[in-house]
Amino acid sequence: MLHLRLFDSSLYYTLASASESSGLASSTSTERSFNGTQGAGGVAAGGESLTPTDVAAVNLTYFTPAISHVMLAPTTIATTTASATMVQIQTTAAPSHDLETGGNSTSSDPGEFDNLNSFYFYETEQFAVLWILFTVIVLGNSAVLFVMFINKNRKSRMNYFIKQLALADLCVGLLNVLTDIIWRITISWRAGNLACKAIRFSQVCVTYSSTYVLVAMSIDRYDAITHPMNFSKSWKRARHLVAGAWLISALFSLPILVLYEEKLIQGHPQCWIELGSPIAWQVYMSLVSATLFAIPALIISACYAIIVKTIWAKGSIFVPTERAGFGAAPARRASSRGIIPRAKVKTVKMTLTIVFVFIICWSPYIIFDLLQVFGQIPHSQTNIAIATFIQSLAPLNSAANPLIYCLFSSQVFRTLSRFPPFKWFTCCCKSYRNNSQQNRCHTVGRRLHNSCDSMRTLTTSLTVSRRSTNKTNARVVICERPTKVVTVPAMSERV
């Protein structure tokens, strides 16, 4: 299955449950029949016991790792007991394939999982999606960093946060998705125990950093809206927020250095983690969900609630006012009571969109994993397909952020449009852009023409008024507005 997941507890949780129930399984089903083929390869069936060679072949067939994230493990795995009969208990690492609640027993029906195919989206589709994600994440975030480097003279706190978030997302693509692709090709872990700990630590750290840099960005937007005139220590505070985000990410990643180690799993060396019991996995996943999603989401929600309240309390950013001498048509000007620049509001909208995408991408994954470790996900082929889709949403967050930058930042779009392949794409949209520009110019020109006509009428009226004041007993009417008539008496000679 495609599960680009950071904290995949399903395999380890399933193996722990299977090890506890292996004694019961060996006493009740010493020989299992397999009809046809299962998953990606066939398993010899009938009443025959499996030889070590057959077991190795089965393990190689079912051991398709999905390792792009922190708790990464084989998608489907066939575990064997140490008994002489080589009883095979097939377990699945997908969230949709949990054992019974509590994890202390397998299904009473030995053929329940025979028709379930954990390779719902098989290797070709998985590799295709992985390569697409990797390409979009790396190219998109590299393009954003390139734009920030080209326009480094235009410094702003928002650009600083965007650069840090793009750097974290780029690391997600290079360390998580690329590692997943490589491990799917090699099957076994071949880098050693030290590299196992270092790479796992790096994967967790960049995942946390992508989240907590977003939290820091939200806090900065909160400060920019609630204290719009506070410029004295804004840059220093922004740097402290980013440094704190990376420091918190590193601290939350430290347990990985202890939990992960290189182990021999089914005859293949793997970078592995074992917690021992389903309860331990429930506690672990609860902590991960809180630190990776729940706490950041609460902080971000609180910041934006205060931002919305502040903007609402200060009134509209642009208030309507009547144009002097041109009827009641509303004009827009900055409010003198609460000055919040238009650019600052635009950055708030962009950050809010990034936060919304973050919640959309992560909440299904977190909820699904929690339901899995607590035994609330039933076994079915449909759930495998659902899990495959949900698990692909996490890295989509890193792929979507660059698109949001281009959508909200004209600077990013203009800079990228000067370089291929973005230049080729903008050329395709040239005709549409020209038509839109002509329509805008026509509208603006018509408004300017009407405005000039009105000014010309007022100037003519004032000229007539000034000339008429030299005549005795003359009365001049200035037609400034059709609804109002102003009468000016002529100056009389002194007697």
UniProtKB/Swiss-Prot annotation:
Transmembrane residue ranges? 55-75, 130-150, 165-185, 240-260, 288-308, 354-374, 384-404
Which positions does UniProt annotate with glycan attachment?
Answer: 35
Its tissue distribution reads: In adults, expressed abundantly in the head and very weakly in the body.
Where is the protein localized?
A: Cell membrane
The job of this chain, per UniProt, is described as: Binds to the cardioactive peptide (CCAP), which is a neuropeptide.
Which GO-annotated molecular functions does the record name? neuropeptide receptor activity; vasopressin receptor activity
The protein's matches in Pfam families, at most eight in alphabetical order, are given as:
7tm_1 (PF00001)
Q: Which residues lie on this side of the membrane: Extracellular?
A: 1-54, 151-164, 261-287, 375-383
Q: What is this protein called?
A: Cardioacceleratory peptide receptor
Cross-referenced PROSITE patterns: G_PROTEIN_RECEP_F1_1, G_PROTEIN_RECEP_F1_2
* Keyword annotations of the record: Cell membrane, G-protein coupled receptor, Glycoprotein, Membrane, Receptor, Transducer, Transmembrane, Transmembrane helix
Gene name of the record: CCAP-R
Give the species.
Drosophila melanogaster (Fruit fly)
Cytoplasmic side residue ranges read 76-129, 186-239, 309-353, 405-495
